[in-house]
Each structure stands twice: as C-alpha cells, then as structure tokens.
C-alpha cells in the first residue's frame, strides 16, 4: 500500500512539473495527428438483403468517409484542425458516398481565449465560413486513468446535443410502431430514405485528456479540459491521437480561415434543411410520377 501511494505521489509530481514547464514556455506550440473512425451498420440502411460480397464492396467505397486522418496544430490559445491533405480521398460517385461528399468540411479554427469558432464548409459546390461562439460541454471529470502512448490520461464524460445534420449519428428509424406497419404494404407510399432517417437528440461523449500537455484544446469541436484531449468516443465515432510533436523545429503558422460566405451554424443548418426539402420534393415527385 505504501509503495502504491509513493508511485501515485511521484506520478502527480511528474505531471505537475510537466505542466509547470510547458505552461511557462513563451512560444509553446504543438502538433497532434488524429485517426478518426465511424462505424456503420448496413443493416440499418437496407443492408440485410445484401450479400456479404455486396456489403464488403459498399463498405470499401465508404471507407474514405468513415476513416480519416486529421492534423491539429495548437498553441496556448488557438488551434486549427484539418484533414491531412496527403491522405484525403476524392469524393466517390453516386449513392450515399456522393451525397456525403456534398458536405465537405474545411479547416476548423478555435480560439479559446476569445471563445470563437470558425470553419470553412462547402455544401453542393458553395463555400461558407461558419462563424460562431465556442460551445463548451459540461464535462464531468473522473479519477479513472489510462496510458495513451507516453502520456497519462484522465477520463471525462459529457452529454452533447447532436447537430440535426451530423451524419455520423444518423440511423434508420426502427420503432416498434414501424415494425408493426411493415406488415401492411401501402402501394401509394412515396416516403423517401431521408424521411426514414433519425438522429438522437443527445449522445454521451467520453474523452481522455492529458495534463502533461496543459492546453484546453482537442480534436474538432472538443475542448475545455485541463489538458490536451487525446481520445474521444462519441456514439459511433472514435477519435484517437497517434502522434504528438511539441515545439517542432519547423513551426506551422495557425492561419485563421477566411474563405466563404460568413454565416452562423444555425443559418448554415437552415440552408442544408432547405436543400434537403428541395431534394425530397424532387425525388418524391419522381416516385409519384411512376
């Protein structure tokens, strides 16, 4: 018991010294590489009737959207998070891949000092610049720890409201009422796949952060913890840091995004909703004309 207590004390001392040294660095900067992966059950999208070979082919085509590599460049107050251009795959042809490629996310800038968020976003060929306030999650910090690479990480949990157009949490409606209605075939039904989609209102976020890197930054929209966030588990998506370089010899300037029509997140969501309504009317009209 004494040995364990001494080890715990030494760990705290090491973390404190690391925090003190880095937090007093004048031009502290870092670079983190993150791998993201989103799982998708094709059974939720009519995949139960597909052969195993068909499922494999579709998942291979979807891989460029479900698995990505991102780079986070950060300092004490700012960060820029963007997809690794060397590994970014071109959008695929039709189907879900073609639809998903219509939502192209650009660099995301966070300024924790000014509570500012900026992100370049392209939607059906039109470029937008989303400008909004940073949304901070109500993190519940725990004493649970684990090692990620050479860093001791602590667990934090939060409940997050899901954006109504976050495709990573989309799933097909599968209520008991719907199952009951499936027995009654309606030949006049023109409901589209989009109308069959639902998104949960909230999801649980589990984050692992390290006080050894004392910046309250993290991948994507995640931030606000007393240390860099190295791992995030959000519903069907996992984000994991695979490499960190602190104070690199060749520093990369954090450039604030500036391209596109300036718009708030709420206004951007309204634009998407309007476009999807147009698509529903267009495809619904085709179905009724058959």
Locate predicted features:
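Bacterial Sec-dependent N-terminal signal peptides
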Residues: 1-34, 288-289
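Extended soluble regions of mature proteins
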Residues: 27-290
